[in-house]
Amino acid sequence: MARAFFRRRKSCPFSAKDAPRIDYKDVRLLQGFVSERGKIVPSRITAVSAKKQRELAQAIKRARHIGLLPYIVK
């Protein structure tokens, strides 16, 4: 009988004790969660929890609105 394949659960990078805070002014952090085309990368790829993904999306949208991040990258 073959063993079942168990995928290792990824942990959220923002749930650790010394994890960085999600802030719209931290452009370097936010750029890691935006694709090269300027789209927000989904949480199934980045392993961010649902709550933190919502906070991250809101921070990216804020940074775009005030001009810290571009809406699209050519």
UniProtKB/Swiss-Prot annotation:
Q: Does the keyword Nucleotide-binding apply?
A: no
Q: Which GO terms describe its cellular component?
A: cytosolic small ribosomal subunit
What keyword terms does UniProt attach to this protein? Ribonucleoprotein, Ribosomal protein, RNA-binding, rRNA-binding
Gene Ontology biological process terms in this record: translation
Q: Which GO terms describe its molecular function?
A: small ribosomal subunit rRNA binding; structural constituent of ribosome
| Xref: Gene3D superfamilies | Ribosomal protein S18
Instruction: Supply the PROSITE patterns for this chain.
Output: RIBOSOMAL_S18
Task: Output the SUPFAM superfamilies linked to this UniProt entry.
Answer: Ribosomal protein S18
Which domain of life, per UniProt? Bacteria
Quote the subunit structure annotation: Part of the 30S ribosomal subunit. Forms a tight heterodimer with protein bS6.
| Family per record | Belongs to the bacterial ribosomal protein bS18 family.
Among PANTHER family, the record links this protein to: 30S RIBOSOMAL PROTEIN S18, SMALL RIBOSOMAL SUBUNIT PROTEIN BS18M
Q: Report the protein's function.
A: Binds as a heterodimer with protein bS6 to the central domain of the 16S rRNA, where it helps stabilize the platform of the 30S subunit.
Name this polypeptide is given: Small ribosomal subunit protein bS18
Q: What is the lineage of its organism?
A: Bacteria, Pseudomonadati, Pseudomonadota, Alphaproteobacteria, Sphingomonadales
Q: What is the name of the gene encoding this protein?
A: rpsR
